Amino acid sequence: MIFVVKKILDFLVFIFTKEKLLLYSKQTKKIDCLIISHLINTNHLIEKNDFYFGSLQSRLSTYKLSSLIALRNFTGKNLRTLSKLPFDKKHYKVVLSSFFKINVEIKIILLFLNEFFRIKILKNKYDKNFSLLKKIGKIKYLKSIFSNIRISEQVIFLIKLHKPKYLFFTYEGHAWERIVIKKVKEFFPKIIIIAYQFSIVTKYHHSMFRPLNKIYNPDIIMTSGSITADLFKRKKLDKTSKILIYGSDKFTSKAHYNLPEKSILILPEGFCNETNILFNFCILASTYLPDFKFYFRLHPLIKKNDFIKKNCIQKIPDNLIISNNTLEKDFENSKYAIYRGSATIIEAVNFGLIPIYYSQKNEISFNPLFKFEKKPFKIQNIKDLNNTLKINFKHEKLRKIRGYCRSFFQQPNSGIIKSLFKKK
């Protein structure tokens, strides 16, 4: 129960330091649209476009619709620290605190304890060796109760404060999304709930495509392209939610075919273990292939200084570079892209790079391009990589994979936004 004690102590510190509940870029009252997004890097505070929703706020303002983006704070910094940083002043933004009102936090702790002991009793009553109960009874699987309940309470609080007619949020299949949908439908049934599927799907993606009782399903699902729109329809989700192809600001209009020959971009996800897997492989590859340049691009969730300290960067080969470039510049510098579960591979392929999926033995695939998961686009070791790099890839060989990626992130369609608000 150390985790619960730590949570209580953190909350007491939060109270006594009089930490803010909300941090606004600029104050606003009544709005048309509330957008729930995520702050994963402090640099994103000054960006005009949101990291997940892109230019949605600007597109809404084109139709004279006011909006507020509420950012869940994953930077590791409190609101007092963030308040000293520059904000984009063009759009309304609010950063949510990692804690909320006292009564809410007490309720969450009680819910957590109730669930923890309920599962303990079930384990003792039925079967101590029942693997599912053993798993979900572990603290690490119950920790999400705190953030899931808190975000639902914060959303309800913001709705009461700003009285929006529409609620947008990112849609990946997380539990908090369904909890928010249910609460909003219960307390504010007239609000139109719009879930935005913005990222990749894998072969084993399930929760996002799982149709539940109507009260847990969004009114509208906006997708990044026709690939996922078709998946939602195939899973019969169009019976409970309207499916619309909105597109994505990650869309690239033109592929580039004259990229540097001996250059490879590495695209890890925003998890430390995944970053380390690709970094270790990259060290081996750059040592074995000294004629190639390797550009290792950290995900915004990974703090570069911390990563450098932990990985003794001074010992890496000279042809391995930890990139500080913009994403587009990294694309321009590279012909190939090695990845695992990163959504950025879709953008890389659309730009003109050749995708190479690095798979470890006996693991479940989480390849966003799983339909093309075979050699030469899939490797498991340096020998495989070397063989792939020797291939003269012609346009015809890449045509299908590029067509798939172009249908995954399509050009944003403002007409979809216009049609939504016309009907209200």
State where each predicted segment sits.
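Catalytic-core helical/loop segments in enzymes performing group transfer/polymerization on anionic/lipid-linked
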Residues: M1-K424
